[in-house]
A protein has these predicted regions:
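Membrane-embedded beta-strand positions of outer-membrane beta-barrel proteins
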Residues: 15-17, 35, 51-53, 86, ...
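Outer-membrane beta-barrel "beta-signal"
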Residues: 105-107, 126-138
């Protein structure tokens, strides 16, 4: 999860925490907690982009260490119904962690969305996960 506190139109501070489990990774469990700064690079009616950098602490099965995190997020509303999003996260450490998530979503109605999503992860094992998604707003 992430907490965001705006400082002005462009700058904000963040508090981050995450839990990740992967049975194929040497360190099955990853818990990250930290704080940092975000900057809104671009904000238009159709496009949004942000970059965030933070200092965090990683708790993992075999090693606990301070890390640096950096993420870039970009969203483009191609039309009223079609949206493209890309989120990239890098974390330093004994084993660097990289995750890039790319998705295309199509709104069937105001409350129902279908989409295609690919998540690439390297930690240090590389793999891709492709999903067909269904989203429902309540």
């Amino acid at each position: 999860g992430k907490l965001i506190k705006s400082l002005n139109d462009k700058h904000y501070v963040i508090g981050v925490s995450s839990y990740d489990y992967d049975e194929f990774r040497t360190n099955n469990d990853r818990i990250v907690m930290g704080a940092g700064h975000g900057y809104k690079i671009l904000r238009t009616e159709k496009q949004k982009a942000s970059i965030e950098n933070s200092i965090a602490y990683l708790l993992a099965n075999s090693n606990n260490e301070p890390i640096v995190r950096s993420s870039v997020w970009y969203a483009y509303n191609v039309s009223k119904r079609i949206a493209f999003t890309n989120k990239m996260l890098w974390e330093s450490g004994d084993d660097d962690y990289l995750r890039n998530e790319t998705s295309f979503d199509y709104s069937l109605t105001e409350k129902v969305t279908i989409g295609l999503k690919n998540t690439y992860t390297k930690d240090p094992i590389e793999y891709n996960i492709f999903n067909i998604t269904l989203g429902v707003k309540f």
